[in-house]
A protein has these predicted regions:
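Small-residue-rich segments of transmembrane alpha-helices in multi-pass membrane proteins
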Residues: 75-89, 136-141, 202-216
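Intramembrane alpha-helical segments
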Residues: 4-96
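Multi-pass membrane catalytic core of lipid/isoprenoid biosynthesis enzymes
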Residues: 1-35, 132-167, 207, 212
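Extended hydrophobic alpha-helices typical of membrane-associated regions
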Residues: 164-222
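Structural signature of hydrophobic alpha-helical transmembrane segments
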Residues: 40-51, 105-107, 171-177
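Transmembrane alpha-helical segments that form the membrane-embedded catalytic/substrate-channel core
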Residues: 51-63, 83, 87-88, 106-121, ...
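Cytosolic, membrane-interface loops and tails of multi-pass inner-membrane proteins
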Residues: 1-7, 116-141, 186-196
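Functional transmembrane core segments of multi-pass inner-membrane proteins
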Residues: 76-124, 142-145
Length: 222
C-alpha cells in the first residue's frame, strides 16, 4: 500500500500506532478477565506473548531487517496466526493445555501461510523490483505453486487427523465444505500465467480459511 502510493508513510505510521495501542488495551482487559489476580504468572506470560505478536506484526515490514522481505514471513505467519492464536486462545478460555490442539492449529497456520503465499505470488514482479526477497521471489513461480498446494493439502491432513482422533459423529467433518473453494483455488493457481489474475483468488482463500475455522468449531461442538 505504501510502496504503491495508496497511503503515505505518515498515515501508515499513525494507523500502526493506533492499532497497537488499541490491541494492547483489549489484550490487557481480556487477560485480566481470563486470569484475574489469582494467576498472575499466566497473565504476565500472555501479556508478553501479546507484545511479541505486536512486535512481530510491526517487524514484518518495518525497518531494514524486516523479516517479511527476507523469506521468513511464512514462518512467522504460521506461528502467530496458527499455533499461538489457536492454542493460546484455548488456554486463555479453558486454563488447560491439550497437545492435540496443535493439529487444528497447524491447519489454521498453513492456510494463513497460503493466504500470504498467494499475496506474494500476485506481487512477485513488484517485490523483485523493490528488492523484497519474499519466499516466492526466492522459490520462483513454479516452486511457489507447489508450495501452495502443500500448504492447503497439509491443512486438510492435519484437520482430518484431529477429527479421527476425536471421532464421534459425521458432522465433525463439516469443515470439508471449506476445502471445496480451496481445491478450486489450487486449480486456478496451477493454470495461472498472469500474476495479477490471482488478486480475486486472495479473497477466496482468506474467506475459505475463515469458513474452515467456523465450520471446524461447529463440527466439534455439535
Amino acid at each position: 500500500m505504501v510502496s504503491s502510493g495508496v497511503i503515505s508513510p505518515k498515515e501508515m505510521k499513525r494507523a500502526m500506532i493506533f492499532t497497537t495501542i488499541f490491541s494492547l488495551c483489549i489484550a490487557v482487559l481480556l487477560i485480566y478477565v481470563a486470569f484475574g489476580r489469582e494467576n498472575f504468572g499466566y497473565s504476565v506470560a500472555f501479556f508478553m506473548l501479546g507484545l511479541a505478536s505486536v512486535a512481530a506484526a510491526i517487524k514484518y515490514t518495518v525497518g531494514e531487517s524486516a523479516y517479511g522481505y527476507s523469506g521468513l514471513g511464512d514462518i512467522f505467519v504460521f506461528l502467530f496466526f496458527g499455533l499461538l492464536s489457536v492454542v493460546g486462545s484455548y488456554i486463555l478460555f479453558t486454563h488447560q493445555i491439550n497437545a492435540l490442539l496443535f493439529l487444528p492449529a497447524t491447519s489454521i497456520g498453513l492456510l494463513s501461510a497460503a493466504v500470504l503465499n498467494l499475496n506474494n505470488m500476485r506481487d512477485q514482479i513488484e517485490d523483485k523490483q523493490h528488492h523484497k526477497n519474499t519466499l516466492v521471489v526466492s522459490l520462483g513461480s513454479q516452486k511457489a505453486k507447489i508450495y501452495h498446494y502443500i500448504l492447503i493439502l497439509g491443512a486438510l491432513v492435519t484437520a482430518v487427523l484431529y477429527v479421527e482422533m476425536h471421532y464421534q459423529a459425521p458432522i465433525q467433518y463439516l469443515f470439508l465444505i471449506a476445502f471445496i473453494p480451496l481445491f478450486l483455488n489450487i486449480k486456478v493457481v496451477a493454470q495461472n500465467i498472469l500474476f495479477s489474475e490471482l488478486d480475486s483468488e486472495l479473497k477466496k482463500v482468506t474467506l475459505s480459511t475463515f469458513l474452515f475455522a467456523i465450520l471446524f468449531g461447529i463440527g466439534q461442538i455439535l
